[in-house]
């Protein structure tokens, strides 16, 4: 069984037992969260598509850890003007383990 969920402004295709990294969620490590924005649930040949969400469908996940992604480098330059700008960014994330999908 799999589902398409929305969290942190992004959509993820998840299945039970998977680990995913999502935008940071304010929850303690080891706590269980419930995601109710489920857009699609599928099992074998049967697929339920919501308008926009599947009513009564939830995904239960456990917070595994919090962390930060690798640093990305931003470099801006204007040629012949001696203008260069360096910047870096590290995005925070929360790692979730999908426990169950109920539809």
From Swiss-Prot:
Give the InterPro entries listed for this entry. Answer: bL21-like, bL21-like_sf, Ribosomal_bL21, Ribosomal_bL21_CS
PROSITE patterns per the UniProt record, alphabetical: RIBOSOMAL_L21
Which protein are we looking at?
Answer: Large ribosomal subunit protein bL21
Its gene?
A: rplU
Q: Which residues form a coiled coil?
A: none
Is NAD one of the keywords UniProt gives this record?
no
Q: Does the entry feature the keyword Cytoplasm, yes or no?
A: no
Disulfide topology? none
Q: Which family does the record claim for this protein?
A: Belongs to the bacterial ribosomal protein bL21 family.
Name the job this protein performs.
This protein binds to 23S rRNA in the presence of protein L20.
User: Which keywords does UniProt give here?
Assistant: Ribonucleoprotein, Ribosomal protein, RNA-binding, rRNA-binding
Annotated NCBIfam families: L21
The UniProt subunit note reads as follows: Part of the 50S ribosomal subunit. Contacts protein L20.
Q: Which domain of life is it from?
A: Bacteria
What is one term from the GO cellular component aspect held by the record?
cytoplasm
Which GO terms are recorded in the biological process aspect for this UniProt protein? translation
Q: What Pfam families is this protein classified in?
A: Ribosomal_L21p
- What GO MF terms are annotated? rRNA binding; structural constituent of ribosome
Q: Which PANTHER family does the entry mention?
A: 50S RIBOSOMAL PROTEIN L21, LARGE RIBOSOMAL SUBUNIT PROTEIN BL21M
